[in-house]
Amino acid sequence: MLRYTCHALFLGSLVLLSGCDNSSSSSTSGSPGSPGNPGNPGTPGTPDPQDVVVRLPDVAVPGEAVQASARQAVIHLVDIAGITSSTPADYATKNLYLWNNETCDALSAPVADWNDVSTTPTGSDKYGPYWVIPLTKESGSINVIVRDGTNKLIDSGRVSFSDFTDRTVSVIAGNSAVYDSRADAFRAAFGVALADAHWVDKTTLLWPGGENKPIVRLYYSHSSKVAADSNGEFSDKYVKLTPTTVNQQVSMRFPHLASYPAFKLPDDVNVDELLQGDDGGIAESDGILSLSHPGADRRRAGRYLCRRAEALSYGAQLTDSGVTFRVWAPTAQQVELVIYSADKKVIASHPMTRDSASGAWSWQGGSDLKGAFYRYAMTVYHPQSRKVEQYEVTDPYAHSLSTNSEYSQVVDLNDSALKPEGWDGLTMPHAQKTKADLAKMTIHESHIRDLSAWDQTVPAELRGKYLALTAQESNMVQHLKQLSASGVTHIELLPVFDLATVNEFSDKVADIQQPFSRLCEVNSAVKSSEFAGYCDSGSTVEEVLTQLKQNDSKDNPQVQALNTLVAQTDSYNWGYDPFHYTVPEGSYATDPEGTARIKEFRTMIQAIKQDLGMNVIMDVVYNHTNAAGPTDRTSVLDKIVPWYYQRLNETTGSVESATCCSDSAPEHRMFAKLIADSLAVWTTDYKIDGFRFDLMGYHPKAQILSAWERIKALNPDIYFFGEGWDSNQSDRFEIASQINLKGTGIGTFSDRLRDAVRGGGPFDSGDALRQNQGVGSGAGVLPNELTTLSDDQARHLADLTRLGMAGNLADFVLIDKDGAVKRGSEIDYNGAPGGYAADPTEVVNYVSKHDNQTLWDMISYKAAQEADLDTRVRMQAVSLATVMLGQGIAFDQQGSELLRSKSFTRDSYDSGDWFNRVDYSLQDNNYNVGMPRSSDDGSNYDIIARVKDAVATPGETELKQMTAFYQELTALRKSSPLFTLGDGATVMKRVDFRNTGADQQTGLLVMTIDDGMQAGRQSGQPCRRHRGGDQRRAGKPDAAGLRRHIAPAERYSAGGGRPVAGERVQVAADGSVTLPAWSVAVLELPQASRRALACR
């Protein structure tokens, strides 16, 4: 595949073929030419009769390696490159991802987890590997993705047994087609198997296949794929390529390709012509052919195009003179603007004009088009199908949509009719200008449906909607007001842009609050399931689930079985499946058609800021698209500029899927522009105050920093943070990871404190979920029957907790578990530096968020059997205290203050309202409501069964107590600036820890914060945190006179509950302190008119 455009255009597929006519692949040579212009090497033309004629080799066509037997299916992967390789091919990493759904359910052993790569080949021969797949029946179909590791070689495919009656099929890497036989696939595979040629600038091609070959050409076809004709000859137009060197600029932009051999295209090559069809690189030497079809990836449309394209505005833009429609589609052969009426009838179709300098297409219309619906009719070569496709597609720059995102709509976001009263004057309640401002952030992560779907005090028509946040007297809004008053400053909304996986047509949806009969109507699979008898029961889905949970067990997990059917047609999804990046999601509006969602979204933002007193953060997902390819309804960008917006495998050309879905390519300039343009709309037109980037490590650091600078020009106080996990993309660019972002001011989530407090890691399963206790669940002080944690390991977890509470600073100095003086970066975290930040505002500390099990469920997994319900509630409070009283930005999941449970669900993204319930009436924490989804948690059923009934299910008393604890902690954080110092140098001067080293009292964390009033003398005593089953006496401090620091929240503790410290902390005259078990105390030492704090 060749690459070249704003970073390179990834072109075609490469195959190594051996032999031509049993001897040579070429004949006499001459100069390439074209009609009327013979011999011009820069213009693709018909080959001169005297030039080399390239032919296919004489390779035997294969038969089937194996045929499917009864209740089996067979999939062959035809590997042309392997056939001609001089060494045997290794297929050990090739595997299948297999899954059932309501319409495709013949598999007897579907793969439960995307990271499960165990379905390796059954066998292989010289033509490639094959798999024998067991079936439950010989009718229907199966879903399959062929992968190398977790990267797709072929996008999602369905094998229908009505189409392939012998259930034996073949596929080719990089090609979505399914073939009836290996012979058919083999014949189609020439030129398709690999894609390792990369067009990196206007005249440079990097291609291993051309190395040391005397004849290297780039073939081209505008109407069909480059392929041999019936005589086995390649007769399409071509240009010659000559060897060159890789310049430093290319090496810096594409470090993972820097070692590839380079070839030069003619200076006068017509790039536009090459971009709009299929291209094929062919090299020949001594009878060995290398073929690459550069058209297989239009990934980069020319740096020279991007510079001009970046300066333009896209979408439907309203001006004084009318509406300008513009779309960037440099590889398209034709684009038409299709205008639709409100009832979606075609009104007009207008050919758009291509700007050759930018690759953008545009059309100018009148102002009467405001409110009109439209789509783009594309004529474009798509490398996945290897043909010129014709289809309509919505506008990736759309600002409004029809129901279910089927049409884009022309809209003026400045229209006063789309703004609630007072919108233009709305400001953020909490300043974000300085590090000290940012350090005060306490973020409450929330999901629109989770906020109100179950709240009976919210009007029925608003439940699960944006406008639920305007229901001032509802339990949910009143609860959020209490959190805000106690110190929660920000609400973060899980994805609220346009989602791909929730149907916005209400007649196609059945939620659990609705009659079971409706579920049967919209999901026909229910009628043939074990639950069919409920279709005429008159019950709601919720009532049936409530009935089923009474007898739910690991051996008969009926709740999850029914909920899996519900999930196929309900309104629930977390939303990490972007469809249109810059339009509010329609299912959260009372009317998904057109502009209602815009005004309702703004009304919600206004209510959060004015009534709740919180700033608003938005969760954004630019690291992947929901789909790619020419056929999927939710593929948008990839239909417009095929394979430009997606990150491709540099060898096969297939779309990478390391994120979860179709990886995007923010390293490409025009996608980076789309991201920045999208963020600008959310910032200016929707008044979002911060952005949380999903899987930010898949973005280049430079792109994130560039976007931040762009958005800070619009709002200087904007805050960026995200998931800075290592994405293994560092060979391509410097990734936006935890360590790389040190000193930038951009925040990243810290897994260091998370894992130390919770115990284990996010991928634990089975007994490991119980064995791996953490600081917050008994490590070293209250071991369970399975734990193997040593005292040394428990002390190391305490070190990571201390470091996290100091803001995870790379240069913070502390005494470690062995008594050694170390910097934060020298504290080990699974082989990585424990401390990585320059300032605590670059660290987002948490012990619970939407990913993985809730904090309560993890405590339930890990707590010792003798830990009673009250102790477990206090474990939750003590765990949260590490976040709330630490120096990093505090982050927490909605419902942690209510002991929120998801009934042990590891990944509740599509587990619906049943498992994601939050009860703002404080009656039920949703614990033990059925076994979680078997596809994710089936391997955990045994351990769940052993621990789930260890203590009583929390009720109103425990939820009120935990709410009081939570508000006490947030009020403590708010009560003094010493908890939120913000600056790394200041933290290192003022924060220290006691009770450290090899002789420490296990289970006692003591942190001191000096207010700086007396240089050279300790002016504060630790916030003290004690875990364990008995009272603990902390050693004598440096100064007497300590007293308890009282948080205002204690005056309104819900239900008159005790503070987190339980019985009053005992402070002796000499300054020694005695703490109850599982408690937190903040002490202060009065000093003149100022106070210094001692925490934990």
Swiss-Prot record:
One of its GO terms (molecular function) is pullulanase activity. It catalyses: Hydrolysis of (1->6)-alpha-D-glucosidic linkages in pullulan, amylopectin and glycogen, and in the alpha- and beta-limit dextrins of amylopectin and glycogen. SUPFAM superfamilies: (Trans)glycosidases, E set domains, Glycosyl hydrolase domain, Starch-binding domain-like. The keyword Cell membrane applies. Its EC number is 3.2.1.41. A lipid is attached at residue 20 (N-palmitoyl cysteine). The active site is at 694 (nucleophile), 723 (proton donor). CDD domains: AmyAc_Pullulanase_LD-like, CBM41_pullulanase, E_set_Pullulanase. Residues 24-50, 1014-1044 are annotated as: Disordered. Its main location: membrane. GO terms for cellular component: plasma membrane. It is found in: Cell membrane. Residues 1-19 form the signal peptide. The record marks 851 as: Transition state stabilizer. Keywords: Cell membrane, Glycosidase, Hydrolase, Lipoprotein, Membrane, Palmitate, Signal. A lipid is attached at residue 20 (S-diacylglycerol cysteine). Belongs to the glycosyl hydrolase 13 family. This is Pullulanase. The gene is pulA.
